[in-house]
Amino acid sequence: MTNKCFDVSIEENIAHIVLNRPDKRDSMIPEFWDELPAIIKDLDDHARARVIVLSATGPHFTSGLDTAVFGSTIENSDNPETLEKLNRQRSAKFYDTVKYMQQTFSCLENCRVPVLAAIQGGAIGGGVDLITACDMRYMTADGFLTIFEINIGMTADVGTFPRLARLIPEGVVKELAYTGRRMLAEEARALGLVNAVFPDHDAMMKAVMDIARQIAAKAPLAIYGSKHIINYARDHSTTDCLDYIGIWNASMLQAAEINEAMAAGRDKRQGDFVDLPTNRVKMGADVID
């Protein structure tokens, strides 16, 4: 798979996805929205990794949506009749586009393995949508985020508000949304939005990769269950979640994995765990397998 916006490597059961357009401040061009979900789907469907690290190159993690590129794709016509029909369709087409873009980030939340965001410089506009869909966030000392959409006269629509409002206090979200101000790394850490702040990119990547290795060493089935249940708990009552996790473990708990984890701890060695099964991508003769 050849990508225009990303480099992908897999080592030690860690998939490292790198935004690779530093000269353009890793802006989100149309290819970005196609490539990221395709990469995540491939990794998840084929169980190619136990954890994903998402990072970038250049001065910023991402400068967000490339509005110049998207503006040039608006359909138009010199024919008044055709233009009138296009205008009638425009709202429905815009809605469809927004839903497509939302799924680009929702795939990070929905994939079975944890996604760690390593953020240097700015996470601007759509960058906030991106990092809030990840499981954990880490940032360099010069890092910041900004809900930049308000500065160009629009409401953020690709995931910032439903996710950010669950991660930090609502009043802070509203201040960021209404003013477009920058939230610096230390403020983000103090509010729990980022897990840790590092002096520079190298120190951050070293630490994030170490955390990724720790995750990759655990039982993938248990990690999958933990991510699924934590996400479920965020959107449901305690009573619902307690019942759901009981049903989950009644059907998914594997004694062999527990025994292996205990033996590995006793013997002071890495556990020999099974990987996640591949996702079904089509129906066939092996429906039960």
What are the residue ranges of the model-derived segments?
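C-terminal long alpha-helix characteristic of the crotonase
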Residues: 138-143, 194-243, 251-256, 273-289
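Conserved CoA-thioester-binding segment of acyl-CoA-metabolizing enzymes
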Residues: 1-57, 285-289
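Crotonase-fold acyl-CoA enzyme core
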Residues: 106-221, 259-260
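Glycine- (often His-adjacent) and acidic-residue-rich active-site loop
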Residues: 48, 56-104, 153
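Terminal peptide-recognition signature
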Residues: 17, 21, 36, 54, ...
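Short loop-to-helix capping motifs
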Residues: 21-22, 218, 255, 268
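Short alpha-helical scaffolding segments that buttress acidic/His motifs in well-ordered protein cores
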Residues: 176-180, 226-229, 245, 265
